Every structure is written in C-alpha cells, then in structure tokens.
C-alpha cells in the first residue's frame, strides 16, 4: 500500500517535487480513512488541528463562517496549517459523499520535514499563499459589509 500512497502523494502539488524515496518515506506515515457522507472531518474554530488530509475518493464541502465557499475532491488536500502550528481550524470540511482519505499526524510530518527542508520550504510557501487568499477574502467581505 505504501507505493500506492507514494504515487498518490506525487500527484498533490505540495508533494509533487518529492523524490521516489522521499514519497515512500512520507507515505509510511499516512493512514487510510473511510468517511461516511455527512461527517465533519474538521470544524472551524476547533483546536483539534493535528492532521493533514489528502482526498483519494469522494467530495466534501468547505464551509467558512457558516457559508459554503467551495467543494473539494480527489487529489485535493486540507489541514496544511496543522503541519506547522497547533492552531484553530480555519474551515469546516464536511463529506458530501462517502470519502476515502489519507491522513498524517503533524508529529509524523515534522519528523519527515526535519530531514527534508525542501518540503518544509514548499509547505511554508503554500501556507503563505493560503493566508494571503484568506486576507483578501476577509477584505472583500469587509468592503461588501460597508
């Protein structure tokens, strides 16, 4: 199963630059989860952000402040902030269909990242992009509310 997960990780932009060896090393730490439709995988504001998710099958709604802001599916991922900081979840993610995901706990990712600084750098760039998008979204909401 590790080789299947490793191949899947290489399809995720965040991990696309991994060597085959790195992908196999990281894949060992991912666990497969099956999630029924209707289950919330994360809840906005909760401090339980200890896992990063990669969706293999199914779709989920992304909900921010009670409003559905997007839909994610196979190849998409979420929970990046949990990989670098124990922080509140920024969105609720709810399964719209039955899902199969691969998850990694932040402490396992950190062990891997310590030995692979290029992965840490790419994650930092990705999280910075997410934060900039969130800042722009909040600015639009603020302008609309004025």
Language-model region placement:
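A small-molecule sensor/coupling module
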Residues: 5, 22-25, 89-90, 107-146
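Regulatory nucleotide-sensing modules
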Residues: 5-6, 10-65, 72
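Structural motif
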Residues: 13-16, 30, 76, 88, ...
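Ligand-binding loop in jelly-roll beta-barrel domains
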Residues: 86-107
